[in-house]
């Protein structure tokens, strides 16, 4: 795709300078960069330069491209300052600083170049920093990163998860970003900085120390808190078996997280693609996921944690729109899982809407399926009439009742009469959705839906191994539909609403599900991944 632009990890160059303090200068002298006065006891200078690299330091064997200007602009820039015990000392604002590559693409390298800030006063005990760009601070809903809120608090208390929607952290010109981190645990978020002290008390020596600090900056990378998903249809696209017809109709995300951490700790895993990372979100462990042990509360619990594309149960309900065009992208909150927690109910996925018509039928016509065979309405009525008992004589009435075309207590005579007189205009796009989970399926105008679980690391080939599924912040997942070999379901695959009689429960392992795909992923650490998808 022409617009596959990489969301880049940004790098921040920080320089710190501590000075020996002695009396004799005014506060105005200090503001002008002269020898600071006694009122500046316990302070140091901090200089910050923000630069987005054209290749991240952790991505060693993958292609990268700069993000767009809308994905890269830096407005508010907050630097949280910590002592050696990870207790916050203060917050330094670098709003308005020119950030490297914040203008987006330019010949594949990004512009503008980074500009170092003027030195700012910070506590002398500053040993570590955490950077946040474009923070979501909407009242009580977002993070409160003011000095009054965070001073004196340990990093473990500051690093909270909040309930959010993707628009809170990923809108044009306002993508929230935070330090990417390097080490294990949540403390890995904090980058150590070196304090440079002058070897004398003259202005020349102070200036020399400032220059030394800026010449040897600490480098800090930040990630966007969002993940990006894109779907395309390969050209040529393979439709099987021969004679079948497939028309792409749209796509949408489902099972998206409702919470996001300020910093999600890095997780190591076996057979990782060099340069790839995995992280721990709020509901990473199986014990942290929604309680699905009680069917009466399962759906409520799941919907409190994730957003799902939902089916309809009545004609008055509106069918959810699945209409994102091929070649488009959207963003979602990070959603990661421990190895044994990679389950259908909690794994972010793509739902594809399409029209699939079997080779024996008129393209985009309505049809029924039953036990692997496809029928027009008239063919189904004939098959039903010629079946003395059992088989379709049993299964079709079950579907009609579930679809609310006949009353639940209708007797055999009433059902037979209804089927005899049933016409195509008595069936709608909602019929097959309301009548879901039956042996008989109805595809109105050949419309169906496919489930595509998003794989994280293609290099993880062992089933249910850590790092195999999930969407990670600052990762861009490109799904490429390559082929199709059969119709999907007439209803939206929704793990929070499983088949009550023959369920694939939300607790089913991702690698044991009957998802309609086989996948292939290659990594590019926005970290950029390509996933080939075969629908069936």
Please provide the spans of the model-predicted regions.
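Short, Lys/Arg-enriched N-terminal segments with co-localized hydrophobic residues
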Residues: 1-6
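Sec-dependent signal peptide recognition
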Residues: 8-15
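N-terminal "leader" segments that precede or initiate the main folded domain
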Residues: 17-18, 28
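C-terminal motif of bacterial Sec signal peptides marking the signal peptidase cleavage site
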Residues: 21-24
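Acidic/polar, low-complexity intrinsically disordered N-terminal segments immediately downstream
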Residues: 28-192, 196-201, 224, 476, ...
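Tryptophan-paired
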Residues: 58, 66-147, 219, 228-232, ...
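Flexible, solvent-exposed coil segments and beta strand-coil junctions
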Residues: 203-213
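Substrate-binding/catalytic groove segments of enzymes
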Residues: 484-493
């Amino acid at each position: 795709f022409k617009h596959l632009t990489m969301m880049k990890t940004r790098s921040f160059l920080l320089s710190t300078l501590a000075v020996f303090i002695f009396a004799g200068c005014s506060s105005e002298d200090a503001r002008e960069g002269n020898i600071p006065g006694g009122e500046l006891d316990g302070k140091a200078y901090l200089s910050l330069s923000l630069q987005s690299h054209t290749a991240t330091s952790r991505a060693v064997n993958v292609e990268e491209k700069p993000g767009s200007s809308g994905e890269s602009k830096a407005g508010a820039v907050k630097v949280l300052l910590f002592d050696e015990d990870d207790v916050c000392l203060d917050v330094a604002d670098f709003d308005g600083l020119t950030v490297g590559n914040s203008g987006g693409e330019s010949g594949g390298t990004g512009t503008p170049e980074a500009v170092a800030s003027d030195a700012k006063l910070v506590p002398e005990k500053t040993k570590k920093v955490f950077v946040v760009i474009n923070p979501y601070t909407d009242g009580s809903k977002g993070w409160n990163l003011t000095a009054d809120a965070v001073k004196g608090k340990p990093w473990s208390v500051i690093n909270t998860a909040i309930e959010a929607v993707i628009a809170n952290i990923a809108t044009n010109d306002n993508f929230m970003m935070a330090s990417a981190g390097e080490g294990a645990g949540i403390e890995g978020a904090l980058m150590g900085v070196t304090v440079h002290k002058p070897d004398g008390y003259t202005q020349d020596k102070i200036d020399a120390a400032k220059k030394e600090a800026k010449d040897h900056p600490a480098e800090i990378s930040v990630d966007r808190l969002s993940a990006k998903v894109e779907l395309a249809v390969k050209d040529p696209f393979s439709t099987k078996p021969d004679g079948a017809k497939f028309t792409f109709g749209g796509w949408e995300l489902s099972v998206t997280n409702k919470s996001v951490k300020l910093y999600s700790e890095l997780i190591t895993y076996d057979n990782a693609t060099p340069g790839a990372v995995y992280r721990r979100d709020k509901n990473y462990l199986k014990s942290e996921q929604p309680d699905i042990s009680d069917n009466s509360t399962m759906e409520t619990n799941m919907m409190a944690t994730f957003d799902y594309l939902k089916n309809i149960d009545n004609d008055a309900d509106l069918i959810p729109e699945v209409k994102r065009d091929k070649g488009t992208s959207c963003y979602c909150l990070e959603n990661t899982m421990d190895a044994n927690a990679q389950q259908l109910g909690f794994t972010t996925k793509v739902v594809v809407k399409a029209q699939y018509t079997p080779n024996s039928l008129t393209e985009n016509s309505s049809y029924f399926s039953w036990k692997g065979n496809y029928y027009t309405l008239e063919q189904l009525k004939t098959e039903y009439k010629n079946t003395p008992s059992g088989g379709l004589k049993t299964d079709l009435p079950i579907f009609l009742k579930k679809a609310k075309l006949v009353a639940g207590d209708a007797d055999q005579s009433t059902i037979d009469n209804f089927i005899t007189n049933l016409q195509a205009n008595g069936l709608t796009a909602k019929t097959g959705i309301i009548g879901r989970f039956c042996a008989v399926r109805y595809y109105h105008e050949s419309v169906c839906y496919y489930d595509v679980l998003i794989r994280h690391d293609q290099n993880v080939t062992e089933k249910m191994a850590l790092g195999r599924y999930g969407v990670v912040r600052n990762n861009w997942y490109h799904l490429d539909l390559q082929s199709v070999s059969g119709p999907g379901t007439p209803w939206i695959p929704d793990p929070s609403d499983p088949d009550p009689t023959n369920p694939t429960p939300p607790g089913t392992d991702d690698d044991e599900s009957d998802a309609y795909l086989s996948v292939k992923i290659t990594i590019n650490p926005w970290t950029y991944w390509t996933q080939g998808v075969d629908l069936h």
